[in-house]
């Protein structure tokens, strides 16, 4: 009986202590990326929707029902 009271008290104290301590916040939860007004291009063998999604020298091609950036030519 005495040990169960100790367990309950320990649980309640740890619960109160965890609520009282402030949680540490990350300095920057989201990274801000600036592409100077232009979205980043997709590299070779990455998914795309149109040719303009792909980097220079690549085009958007269909392979096995997937659209991928592939070399032109």
From Swiss-Prot:
The keyword Secreted is annotated on this UniProt entry: yes
Subcellular location: Secreted
Main location: secreted
Keywords: Disulfide bond, Knottin, Secreted, Signal
Cystine bridges: 41-55, 48-60, 54-69
Signal peptide (from-to): 1-20
Entry GO terms, CC: extracellular region
Entry similarity comment: Belongs to the UPF0499 family.
Entry text on domains: The presence of a 'disulfide through disulfide knot' structurally defines this protein as a knottin.
Protein name: UPF0499 protein CHGG_06021
Organism: Chaetomium globosum (strain ATCC 6205 / CBS 148.51 / DSM 1962 / NBRC 6347 / NRRL 1970)
